[in-house]
Structures are given as structure tokens and as C-alpha cells.
Amino acid sequence: MFGSVGLNGMSLTDQLYLAQANVIREIAEDAPCVVVGRCADHVLRDFPNKFDFFIHGSIEDRIKRIQSCGDYEIEGKTPQAALEKMDKQRSTYYNYYTGKVWGKCDHYDMCINAGRLGVEHSVDIILEYVNRLKK
């Protein structure tokens, strides 16, 4: 997909994806874990006890969040431009490796607007959801 071709004819990006997928599966087989991104919903699609959440927010809420975490500037871009570029990269990566559409609600157990709820309430809702389904 991306990048130069490695020794086995696969791109370095494809090799990295496969290596990450293997590590994610190994960790998930050993113990409960939380994986953020890396197409983990797809990588772990055959794991029966997994939960998939998509955390999102408006661009304005996300800018406030990153600015509250300190100085945030990528390659001299504004926070909005950096977020838009990052979203485009995430979408392209996810869509390519999963064959699904990044952020589409029917791929997840739950989509949460953390911009409206805040981080703490979002975590509370996720924990409540997981705990209820584990019973």
C-alpha cells in the first residue's frame, strides 16, 4: 500500500501492519488488554470476548482537548490542519487494511462522542457497558 518494497516483495508498511497484528493477537491471547487504533477491531475480529469502541468528537472539541494537553503543532500546521491530516491518514490506513470504512458506527459495539461527554464520563460508560456484558 504505502512506502517502499521490502525484501519479501511486501511494502514496509504492509510488513509493519502484519507485525503489529501479530503482536496485538499475542497480547490479546495472553490477557485482557486495551488496544487503541492499529485496526485492532479487525485484527481481533475472531476473538469472542472483545469490545470495539469508536471515540470521536467535533473538530472544535478535539482542538480544545489537544491544546489543553500542551503545545500541539505538527510540521508547523495549525491544530485543525494537523487533525484533518491525521484523520485522513487514519481513514486511509484503516479502510485499506480492513476493507471497511473508518468511523462507520456499525463496525463498533458503541461510538462515543467524548467531546460532549468528556474523557471521564466516556470511560465510565465504556466500563459500564463491558461490565454489564461480562455478567
Identify the role of each PLM range:
Residues 75-120:
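Small-molecule kinase domains that catalyze NTP-dependent phosphoryl transfer to phosphate-bearing small molecules
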Residues 37-42:
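Short, polar loop motifs at secondary-structure junctions
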Residues 1-32:
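ATP-dependent small-molecule kinase phosphotransfer cores
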Residues 21, 119-127:
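Short, amphipathic alpha-helical "lid/cap" segments that border enzyme active or binding sites
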Residues 46-69, 76-85:
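Conserved phosphate-donor/acceptor-positioning beta-strand/loop module used by diverse small-molecule
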Residues 128-135:
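Short, charged, intrinsically disordered terminal tails
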Residues 27, 43-47:
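RNA pseudouridine synthases
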